[in-house]
Structures are given as structure tokens and as C-alpha cells.
Regions:
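ATP-binding pocket architecture of kinase catalytic cores
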Residues: 1-132, 145-148
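Catalytic-loop of the protein kinase fold
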Residues: 132-134, 139
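ATP/Mg2+ or Mg2+-diphosphate-binding catalytic cores
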Residues: 104, 185-196, 200-212, 229-272
Length: 272
């Protein structure tokens, strides 16, 4: 609630906060209420049918990038978010956190995951001035209006201060171009005709932000690696029967997804 409240008077579209309650006796935990934001979340190919024109879909992609640039343009100190997190050592902390998560959740040895970790450790880019980092910025974490404009950015749980390239890198991981090799469990809306390619998104980001993206490959590799580890955690819980479907075909999909994400990360580190 602190983040969305702080961003309410900036160029970043967020849902207005109606109220916040710290009394745990009400629901069992502190909670807040936001205003309802009208509009679709574009999570899968069938959900973009309401935007049938190629020009609309292109604008959706460009508006997504423009909004990301607006997040990174906010001065954390000016909006009361200067204490949101440490400003230095962002990548090192990410590597430590997710390597630890891998050791806790892995169900088998995957050399690619370890190799990527070693390569990322050896090639940490120099960090510039820290910005607000959303932490999970992708197409289906925003709400669009009927014009294809970003009405609200949601899911700020991973927000911190750090390197803005982390957001752009993860956006490139989630943004699948038409014709790209598909990954099981990942069928994003962007595979439909009309959406800009991820290379065009990067060009747009440079245009509107003026930022140096020379380290982007590093953060794309980091994004694939983190996502592989997250999916491994889901796969571990799935395999343990936490979802009541142990042994089903879904387990095979999770297994394949982790391996493919790790392979993508490994392939990307070869560019470093």
C-alpha cells in the first residue's frame, strides 16, 4: 500500500487506494482496499480479441514500455520511497537470494542452472543510479482501458530499489515474439499478430528513457534464470502433491518448462 499510495500523484497509473486497515482481527491480517479499475488483463491469446487491429496491439506494447519508463523516471526520494531498499548491490543480492532459493527447492541437479549462476556472478555489470524497480513487470500485470492505454499497473509485491534494466530484461523474457519457440505453460498474448517485437520494445524504451541498455543481455539471462528457479519451486510443490495432481501431465510440463528456461538463460549468458 505504501508504494501505490506514493505513486498516486506521479505519471505512473496505479489503482487509487480507498483505505488501509492494520487491525488483524478484521481479516486475520492487515489489508487495504483499492478502487476497481475497469479494463482487461491480457494474459492469453484469446483475451486480445477485443483489440483486433494491428495498430491497437502495437500501441498496447508501446504503452507498456512508456509506462515502464515512467516508473523508472520517478525519484524515490521525492515520493517517500527512498527507504524502500538498498540502492547498491542490487544484482549481487538477487543472485544470492535466488541461488539460495534454488538450493532449497530443487528436485534434481540441473547443471545449466549452476553454470548460469557462475557466469552471472563473474559478469555483474556496473550499476548506475538506482530507480524504483517493479520486480515483475509484464503485460499481464497491467490493466488496459478500451483504448489500449495502461489504466493501472498492479502486483507491486516485489518492488524495490535497484537497476532498472532488471525490469526491462524480465519484460523481454515474458514477451514472446510470433514464431519464437514456445515454452510449456507460457502462451502469452504477444504471440498474436500485430504486437511489436521485443527488439522494438527495447528501441522504444531507449527512445523515451534515454537509458543505456548495453547490459540488457545480462538482465535477460538473469530473468530466465530467476524464472526457472521460481518454476522449479512450483514443480517441487506439485511433485509433492501440494496441488493434488501428483503424477499428472502437468508435472511433465513444469519439468520441461524449468529445463527450457534454464537453457535459455545459459544461451543468453554466452553473449556476455
Amino acid at each position: 500500500v505504501k508504494i501505490v499510495t506514493a505513486l498516486a500523484d506521479t505519471d505512473v497509473p496505479v489503482p487509487p487506494v480507498v483505505g488501509y486497515c492494520e487491525d488483524e482481527e478484521v481479516t486475520g491480517a492487515p489489508f487495504y482496499v483499492m478502487e476497481f479499475v475497469e479494463g482487461p488483463v491480457l494474459r492469453s491469446p484469446d483475451q486480445v480479441a477485443q483489440f483486433p487491429e494491428a495498430a491497437q496491439r502495437r500501441e498496447i506494447g508501446m504503452n507498456l514500455v512508456d509506462t515502464l519508463a515512467s516508473i523508472h523516471a520517478v525519484d524515490p526520494d521525492q515520493v517517500g520511497l527512498g527507504d524502500l531498499g538498498r540502492r547498491d548491490g542490487y544484482v549481487e543480492r538477487q543472485l544470492k537470494r535466488w541461488e539460495g532459493q534454488w538450493q532449497k527447492s530443487k528436485t534434481r541437479e540441473l547443471p545449466a542452472v549452476e553454470t548460469v549462476h557462475e557466469r552471472l556472478l563473474a559478469a555483474v555489470p556496473e550499476q548506475g543510479p538506482a530507480t524504483i524497480v517493479h520486480g515483475d513487470y509484464r503485460l499481464d500485470n497491467v490493466i488496459y482501458n478500451v483504448l489500449g492505454e495502461v489504466a493501472a499497473v498492479v502486483d507491486w509485491e516485489l518492488c524495490t530499489l535497484g537497476d532498472p534494466m532488471a525490469d526491462l530484461g524480465l519484460l523481454c523474457v515474458y514477451w514472446v515474439d510470433p514464431g519464437d519457440d514456445s515454452i510449456p505453460l507460457f502462451q502469452p498474448a504477444t504471440v498474436e499478430p500485430g504486437f511489436p517485437k521485443k527488439s522494438e520494445l527495447v528501441e522504444r524504451y531507449v527512445e523515451v528513457s534515454g537509458r543505456d541498455v548495453s547490459a540488457l543481455d545480462y538482465f535477460v539471462a538473469l530473468g530466465y534464470w530467476k524464472l526457472a528457479i521460481i518454476c522449479e519451486g512450483v514443480y517441487a510443490r506439485f511433485s509433492a502433491g501440494a496441488y493434488g495432481s501428483e503424477g499428472s501431465d502437468g508435472g511433465a510440463d513444469f519439468d520441461a518448462t524449468v529445463k527450457m528456461l534454464a537453457a535459455r538463460a545459459l544461451e543468453t549468458t554466452e553473449k556476455l
